[in-house]
Amino acid sequence: MFVWGASEFFSERSFFVILQKINRMRILQEVEKHIKVDAEIERFFYEECETRTIEKGKLLSEQNHYNRNIYFVEEGMLRMFYYENGKDITSNFYSEGKITANIDTIFKNELSKNNIETIEKSIITTCNYHKLEELCSVSLTAANF
């Protein structure tokens, strides 16, 4: 059991749900720096996104696979890299507050050319690109972002 305040008790699952909501609020605060968040955008972040803590060295996306997820880095660091002639080549790093995805899969419907891994313990919020497209079809604000 976790203690929240003097008299409120939450289970571990309830505590995790609260942390997810806090993380989604952080994303919404970042988005609000650029656009006015409408009800559909807010609903999207609460219902369609998932926040997870991921240990160092875990692959979020693998080269030569289809991956249509978008990754929001809440805490930690991601590395995008690929293998060429047996060599591990880093193409980019994504720190807190950054967004990444395998754009070759999302926009060209091709196998991913890159791997995405956590290079430290990270809190990542993900959403499926198809769900984001659905949001843009009902929210003019999101579509114009």
What is the role of each PLM region?
Residues 10-11, 16-19:
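Short hydrophobic targeting helices and cationic amphipathic motifs
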Residues 18-50, 105:
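Cyclic nucleotide-binding regulatory module and flanking cytosolic helices
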Residues 50, 59, 77-82, 99, ...:
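Short beta-strand segments in beta-sandwich/barrel cores
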Residues 57, 68, 72-79, 96-97:
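Glycine- and acidic-residue-biased ligand/ion/polar-headgroup-sensing regions
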Residues 60-65:
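Short phosphate-coordinating micro-motif centered on Lys-Gly-acidic
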Residues 90-145:
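Cyclic-nucleotide recognition modules
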